[in-house]
Swiss-Prot record:
<keyword id="KW-0997">Cell inner membrane</keyword>
<dbReference type="InterPro" id="IPR021147">
    <property type="entry name" value="DUF697"/>
</dbReference>
<feature type="transmembrane region" description="Helical">
    <location>
        <begin position="111"/>
        <end position="131"/>
    </location>
</feature>
<feature type="region of interest" description="Disordered">
    <location>
        <begin position="1"/>
        <end position="61"/>
    </location>
</feature>
<keyword id="KW-1133">Transmembrane helix</keyword>
<dbReference type="GO" id="GO:0005886">
    <property type="term" value="C:plasma membrane"/>
</dbReference>
<dbReference type="InterPro" id="IPR006507">
    <property type="entry name" value="UPF0283"/>
</dbReference>
<keyword id="KW-0812">Transmembrane</keyword>
<feature type="transmembrane region" description="Helical">
    <location>
        <begin position="77"/>
        <end position="97"/>
    </location>
</feature>
<dbReference type="Pfam" id="PF05128">
    <property type="entry name" value="DUF697"/>
</dbReference>
<comment type="similarity">
    <text>Belongs to the UPF0283 family.</text>
</comment>
<keyword id="KW-1003">Cell membrane</keyword>
<keyword id="KW-0472">Membrane</keyword>
<protein>
    <recommendedName>
        <fullName>UPF0283 membrane protein RHE_CH02332</fullName>
    </recommendedName>
</protein>
Amino acid sequence: MSKPPSDLPRRPPAAFAYEDEAAEPGDNGRQQQGRRRPESFSEDIVLTPDEEDPFINPDRDPSAVAVATPRKRRTSFGKIALAAFGILLSLGIGLWTDRLIRDLFSRADWLGYAALGVLAIGILAVLALVIREAAGMMRLAAVQTIKAEAEAAILETRPAKARAVVSRLTTLLAANPETSKGRATLKATEGEVIDPPHLIALAERELLAPLDRKARALIVNASKRVSIVTAVSPRAIVDLLYVLYESVRLIRAMAELYGGRPGTLGMFRLLRDVLAHLAVTGSIAVGDSLVQQVLGHGLASKLSARLGEGVINGLMTARIGIAAMDLCRPLAFRAVKRPGIGDFIGDLTPSMSPRGNNP
């Protein structure tokens, strides 16, 4: 079968020149103007670090609470003066006690011996108190030592240091029944994991993940109590005192949960570190960022002003709990997600959370 003849004349073959310059008319103008002369610019070039670049780290939460770290202990003139006057006061009390006992002996021997017995009981009580406070400070120091050793062990190529860290962590949390299953898992897999980062991550998931869930429950309960008391209290001073009470109680519970069990002096040190962290990060006051977190969820149109203040104080208590969690936790957050302030908004305002909208 042949094609039917066509009436159109055939076009002879031809060659066409393809020029890129013809397709870009703007280039001709630039060529006519000539090249730009070299220039110098006085503005400084600011490079954004990779960890702060939102395009490199799209999952980074810009409103996340900064990680709290213990303050470095420095010797100051105030501490030296306080120690000097403390020694003078102790010497004065000693001289007064000596003169008192001598006067009692001069009056009657049994009064002098009774005073000596009371003095011995007081000295023993003070020694017991000093031992208890020293033990609490040592436990807090042990928590920070384990955290520092874990960070150093992750950079090692051999698992010896990582296994030593896991062993110390297991000993620290041995008295906590929440870690019994994790300790059994670590003992069953002993010697199987040889990579230090994976070994530290396994210990964090098995030992600290159950404690993290309990710590989150402590923060939520304390924040709810603060919110309720703030909403119903008639005076602002009552709010302030109750927030302080709940904060101290929450910090102590957090330290005991992670094996710290601080004494009175250790508790003051923890409280000072938490308050210093919040003051540095601007979280101790009700700032614009905290208000935006609440108002951004529609609370301005759905809650009263007093109840809104309760939610804000509850979120401030949650910030204190997160800071205490950072300070008291024996390992830094790596294998387990660190809680943020946004994780507690749904608990304080269930009507604003997705599950609260479901029938």
